[in-house]
Amino acid sequence: MYFQVSLPHVPEGAFGMMLIQLFVAMVEDCVNESVYYPAHLAGMEVDIGASASYSGFVLSLEGLSDKLGEVALSYFKTMTSLKIDADRFEKRKEERLRDVHNLCLNPARHAKRALEVLLKQKDATQEDKANALQEMTAADLQAFADGIWQHAHVESLMIGNLTKDEACDVGERIRACLPGAPIPDNSWPETRIARVPQGAHLFSIKAINADETNNVVLYYFQLGESTWRGRAFIILMQSLMHEKLFDQLRTKETLGYSVSCSFDSTHEILGYRVSVESAFHPPHFVSSRMAAFLRSFPEILDNMDDASYEKTRQSVVDDILADDVNLREEAIRHWAHLVNQKYQFHRGRHVAQIISEISKREAADWCREFIQPFAPGSRHVSVHIHAKNHPVPANGSEHALGMGDAHFDISAELKNVWGLLPQQGCATAVEELIMPDSSSGTIHRAVARTGQNLDADTESTQDKSLSLRSQWAADLAEMRSECGASCACRRAKTGPVFVLPTPKK
């Protein structure tokens, strides 16, 4: 069982982020002996944590017991009636403060956190979080716990050995213990990231650990809103580049011990990352070698023999369409589409089909257009973590971020200048998505409200085609409600329980 709780009354900024994290910690503290430990002895796994957007939390329960619903209900009852013990609060606050200070001691993690602070609409530096924690009192957290349930929205995935009636019963009992009302349409929490302008944007940051010897250079290329075609290219590019990147920069040039590339989809905005960690070379030299490799990679693809390209492409398709190994893997796959609130349970199938049709030349041209550092058309962010042997330049074109030193934190200012990309996904689209009318107008409206924007500028001509709309109509028709007319989930302001589609990914 998985539950995602959205709470619009979480305050903005670092103080609100720490409130939700300490709230979760105090819930864990309260249920540890009475609920968590007995559940653990019974073979159940329970985890609760703040959501990635800090606008709620996620509760997950796994196990073979038929008491999972009772455990979930116990957690929700505790959360909606939480009383803060001052002594336990101070203990948990101290633990969290230590975690905040230690999180970015690793330079690679430091670089990732710096990028998140730059991009995410709702994020803050570790220093801001630490300051917020130090100012927080037990009374602040109690007021927060009493006020956040004015409006709430809970989405759940229940999968495994339970019937629809049992699932509806769990949902109804949890709904009954929620004291507030549904979230108004104009109050939904937003999860957006900054729109990186065209060009290169460099940020130099001093390592937090004064004795650190490893430098890190992290490249990030923003590609725009997530589409099937965009995901297909970026997933294929990762597989094509990974081995050659490691061979060139790690094996041949011995640039650094850790060399990697990966695709990114923070809040359903596509990006591509390349990272190198080096103890021997200054960040500007590491960056120059990374840029040289990326500039040469389209030509490497052009010269790649057809058999090798076909083999790599087919392996990517096979991996996407592979059967789930167990129920947990299947649940995680479905849950990802609920968390991003796009509900595109068939997305992997469409992405795999597009990958199978991408030619070697198309892959090389795509790389030339999007994954080229310092090119005018690319949207490129470069984060440099400077260790003690290679300090941050006193003068230069780089921005200096307040992430462990005394420099001015310009992340909030930059996000105001850069602007934000549109919100992706919509939780209120569930009912239309699951129960579409036969009319094409309703189907098109359901598609638009679930984030597959057929009229967006980022969509290609192929994605706008009538055949895609027809395919969406077929997909939507497969998602049918199983609830009876008298089911509690049919009441006003609620959505139906439904059976997840059978096609893989």
Language-model features: locations:
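Short, conserved charged micro-motifs
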Residues: 12-14, 68-70, 164-169, 228-231, ...
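M16/insulysin-pitrilysin zinc metalloprotease superfamily fold
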Residues: 16, 26, 30, 34, ...
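A short linear hydrophobic-aromatic micro-motif
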Residues: 44-46, 256-262
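Active/ligand-binding-proximal structured segments within catalytic/core domains
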Residues: 2-34, 99, 229-241
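Short beta-strand-to-loop capping motifs
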Residues: 5-7, 61-65, 158-160, 221-223, ...
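C-terminal regions of mature proteins
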Residues: 1-3, 103, 109-211, 220-224, ...
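Short acidic (Asp/Glu) and glycine-rich catalytic loops that position anionic groups and cofactors
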Residues: 4-5, 50-55, 72, 120-124, ...
